[in-house]
Design a protein with these regions (language model features):
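Short, compact, well-ordered microdomains
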Residues: 50-75
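Extended non-catalytic interaction/regulatory regions in multidomain proteins
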Residues: 1-52
Length: 75
């Protein structure tokens, strides 16, 4: 798979347990990961979270720019 790919490909990689990021994001060391709930989790469905440039983990929602971008990469 090339270094830069579509958001749809990023979703496939997230489902495989990989971390993905956009080359165009301003903050470095930012990435996304798919969290799958376990028995101890308060969440009941999988969700995507982001590691921010400050090192925090937060829930993430894609913008239209993110969805249409072709600069996604595996971290």
């Amino acid at each position: 798979m090339p270094a830069n790919f579509y958001f749809g490909d990023a979703l496939i990689f997230l489902r495989q347990g990989k971390k993905v990021a956009r080359f165009g994001w301003n903050g470095k060391n930012m990435w996304l990961h798919l969290q799958k709930p376990d028995m101890n989790s308060k969440m009941t469905l999988p969700y995507i979270y982001m590691k921010t440039a400050q090192g925090d983990l937060v829930p993430w929602l894609a913008s239209q720019t993110d969805i249409l971008a072709v600069d996604w990469e595996i971290v």
